[in-house]
Amino acid sequence: MSSFRVGGKVVEKVDLCRKKQLVWRLDVWPFAILYTVWLTTIVPSIDFSDACIALGGLSAFHILVLLFTTWSVDFKCFVQFSKVNSIDQADACKVTPAKFSGSKEVVPLHFRSQMTDSASSGDMEEIFFDFRKQRFIYSKELGAFSKLPYPTKETFGHYLKCTGHGTEAKIATATEKWGRNVFDYPQPTFQKLMKENCMEPFFVFQVFCVGLWCLDEFWYYSVFTLFMLFMFESTMAKSRLKTLTDLRSVRVDSQTVMVYRSGKWVKLLGTDLLPGDVVSIGRPSTQTGGEDKTVPADMLLLVGSAIVNEAILTGESTPQWKVPIVGQRSDEKLSIKRNKNHVLFGGTKILQHSPDKSFSLKTPDGGCLAVVLRTGFETSQGKLMRTILFSTERVTANSWESGLFILFLVVFAVIAAGYVLVKGLEDPTRSKYKLLLGCSLIITSVIPPELPMELSIAVNTSLLALVRRGIFCTEPFRIPFAGKVDLCCFDKTGTLTSDDMEFRGVGGLSNCEEAETDMSKVPVRTLEILASCHALVFVENKLVGDPLEKAALKGIDWSYKADEKALPRRGNGNSVQIMQRYHFASHLKRMSVIVRIQEEYLAFVKGAPETIQERLVDVPAQYIETYKRYTRQGSRVLALAYKRLPDMMVSEARDMDRDAVESDLTFAGFAVFNCPIRPDSAPVLLELKNSSHDLVMITGDQALTACHVAGQVHIVSNPVLILGRSGSGNEYKWVSPDEKEIIPYSEKEIETLAETHDLCIGGDSIEMLQATSAVLRVIPFVKVFARVAPQQKELILTTFKAVGRGTLMCGDGTNDVGALKQAHVGVALLNNKLPLSPSDSSKDDKSKSKKSKLPLEPASKTITQNGEGSSKGKIPPQNRHLTAAELQRQKLKKIMDDLNNDEGDGRSAPLVKLGDASMASPFTAKHASVAPVTDIIRQGRSTLVTTLQMFKILGLNCLATAYVLSVMYLDGVKLGDVQATISGVLTAAFFLFISHARPLQTLSAERPHPSVFSVYLFLSLIGQFAVHLTFLVYSVKEAEKHMPEECIEPDASFHPNLVNTVSYMVSMMLQVATFAVNYMGHPFNQSIRENKPFFYALIAGAGFFTVIASDLFRDLNDSLKLVPLPQGLRDKLLIWASLMFIICYSWERLLRWAFPGKISSWKHKQRAVTANLEKKKKV
């Protein structure tokens, strides 16, 4: 078998191949034959000059083949490798990565003898390849490649029995298998990066064009273009070198760690750790000068607990409490996603730890006992590094579309070149060299030299704008996706609502409908549960943890001490000592503690009302009605319960089975919390709704609470229906929040129902939909998803994508990881202050001259506006003694510094640092607000329209150039060297200025066209080209009437004449008009007048045309090789140019009105996908 499907997030497919011997390669032997034929047959039979042309063509073709082996991995495999069916015959493999994970690569296949633990079993052969710092192993049993396995899916019982690597043989085997715990990335050099850039297809093509222009005597233009190319490529290489050097500085901490090997504790460097090692990890005591200790690898906490700062991975500064697996069911398998509160992730810092000396294996330094799970690039930090590392390549917008569009233009260029070739060969006196040169120039004119640079700038400008707003992106290709988003999904808690919870009181203990706020009237047992059933912890003498739990403690007026003891601030109540915690788990929807009050042991439990209900001995009569009443009001409700435990030892309490602790409970009331909606949630979501986006809420909260909040933030506006099970049966029905409207559930009527109602479903309903294969029929029409588990959030996003929705998911980056990764655009919000106020933002967009670049602060600081713009023109006191010239020099130095730093180069993406990015999501926003969603969508739309206008302008310039270089070239019309240089500079300046247009502050209801291939763009191109062609043809024909009847030789050197002059002037005006007409300003970007540099460049271009056409400065026209125009011809040119502009402008505006961008018709795709699924089920 020559091909293997790998699946997964990194590699999709692997093809086996074998390298051919040098003489049998397709880039060697065919050309050896061709060169021999040229030497023995062609040279003797034709003129030497024609033979040299043939040799030049053959050499160019050979060089092109060699270059294609660098550009295309598929072509390289075809030329230099042969396919093999057996893995034993292969020595390399072609790796096809998963979509959006980079480009294909050919990597060597390694065969080696694998060491085994037992000498008697002999050595086994291991076959593997390394791809992007990951190893893939071939399994002969399965006949497939899979990722190198790490011990991450064993049972808790297995980990608790771990004693590390017991022998030197096992250590050697593990070292050979997994390697050292390092981030090994070779240091690149400037020369290597520059060589890579110079081997890019666009760059080679541009250098080839420069060579052709030199042969056609365009020396100034060629040298200018070549200088510009090398300047930009060297800037790019320098910027990438800095980025990669910064990434290489990230190292696994080389601190020493106590490791249990061969039956004893030994001190080893963190870089020597291996998966399976048992280690002692903790923060050194302050007496020994200990600092925050960095965790060197991903490890599972066996014994002891730790408080960890995970900001380097999640960007979230709130410390996380890590607990041991002691007390968990021994047969339960580890899932790092689900059991992350037991896992210490590499790169994070231990703030404090609590050892447990009751375990059989004692740590020598008082640390926590842990077992290493993953090392090196397989750790969470390593994965994030890989994401950042392999997204530092050059980024472009719509690369496949740009290729197809250029191919479309090449067709026209080839037709024009063919016309010139046929006509030229009819004249036997024509120089074949000049003829072939002319044809080559026509075909190469399709792609201007600045195109790749401008496409990169389109994305990178957006990246920089987002970074200045505190939004970091690790996957730049997703920015254009943001412009295509039509569905925005939001988590509720901590995203739409504030983290500052308000404790409203306790309900459900009396017949009173309002929650009891007087804590003296609340049973002491209920207060004890609220005071102790939590996961709060002291870090550096400060209480940290869930804001809801802190609000409850404050609301009941109890205190909590560092020794895990809770006691009332007033009165003589008993203290509550926590003995064992069972932390909150999203799949269980509850948490519990075992406490001791005086000499009595009790279990305190809190969780979702419907979850606790199933575990109560007696359910109060008004239980359901009470919690539903509070949730309808938008409150968050937690059910409280307890049970008495028999007398026991402390060790027995800690070993109790969680399920036994959390069963047969006695109800103790409902804790009711108000969850205030963030001030800007409703305005931001209303703006999104008004800008043609559908809104969806996905939350783990209760359905009634979710629907109440959804109504306040404009997600639902129609009457709401909630899908639920009817009574104890298995039938489902739609019920309104007040239970006055009830409609039987039928999956076939969902679409009709969704037209008049907003639908809400819960996690249990999703399980039903999965069981009945109705997911695709129902989920696309739902507005609110409540009580959903993290895995269900992922399923919801996958379903929306399957029916053709452009999805954005906004969450907090902890419970929403799967959904954030699945969405086209995932935005993780971190709780930091906003970097800019709305007023600052609007000022920023109004005036570029008054705005200075925002400095990037460390992750812990707020990003503030700074620089010249904030001083409002006043000279700082320390600079008042400087002269005007010195001040000017300082300003110039500051500008140069800005250009030279790592963010001043719009050509390269800004470096995303660890701590800025979240491993949860492609976009990380350091805001306690959903406002970044609008910023990301604005930048996405801006990138889309900028790319679209670039291609339109490119298309029109290409079609006009193809005509000028073909039909007019045959008539002897040419451009001078200076003329071509000025034209090139003008085009580059225009492209640069349009790519830096900033998006408008307000999102428009109008949508950008998602693709280059649309009716609007095609009609716009054809219509404008027809007008341009008419203007060009009539102008040249008019000029010919004033020309003396002289024969102009097409191959003759350039000399000024009237037709050449008119041709240049018309080309200049067409260029200015093309940029002015096709600039996409409102409603997405700044208008032409607001984009000052572009506006002034247009005025300068139009003014330049008027000046040279009016012949105001004769010396200027002489230097440009332009002859004087007759008065009548001059007036006609100016009138025709004005008419051409008005007609093109009107045509463009008419098409924008007639063919606006629209949301894709996802319902058609939903029906098609559902019908296809039905067919598969029948088969």
Curated annotation (Swiss-Prot):
Highly expressed in root meristem. Expressed in pavement cells of trichomes, stipules, stamens and pollen grains. InterPro entries: 2TM_P5A-ATPase, ATPase_P-typ_cyto_dom_N, ATPase_P-typ_P_site, ATPase_P-typ_TM_dom_sf, ATPase_P-typ_transduc_dom_A_sf, HAD-like_sf, HAD_sf, P-type_TPase_V. It is a multi-pass membrane protein. Changing residue 699 to I: In pdr2-1; increased inhibition of primary root growth in low inorganic phosphate conditions. CDD domains: P-type_ATPase_cation. Residues 43-50, 216-218, 423-435, 968-979, 1035-1059, 1111-1128 are lumenal. GO terms for molecular function: ATP binding; ATP hydrolysis activity; metal ion binding; P-type transmembrane transporter activity. Gene3D superfamilies: Calcium-transporting ATPase, cytoplasmic domain N (3.40.1110.10), Calcium-transporting ATPase, cytoplasmic transduction domain A (2.70.150.10), HAD superfamily/HAD-like (3.40.50.1000). Residues 1-20, 72-192, 239-402, 454-947, 998-1013, 1080-1092, 1149-1179 are cytoplasmic. GO terms for biological process: cellular response to phosphate starvation; meristem maintenance; pollen germination; pollen maturation; stem cell fate determination. Belongs to the cation transport ATPase (P-type) (TC 3.A.3) family. Type V subfamily. This is Probable manganese-transporting ATPase PDR2. It comes from Arabidopsis thaliana. The lineage of its organism: Eukaryota, Viridiplantae, Streptophyta, Embryophyta, Tracheophyta. The gene is PDR2.
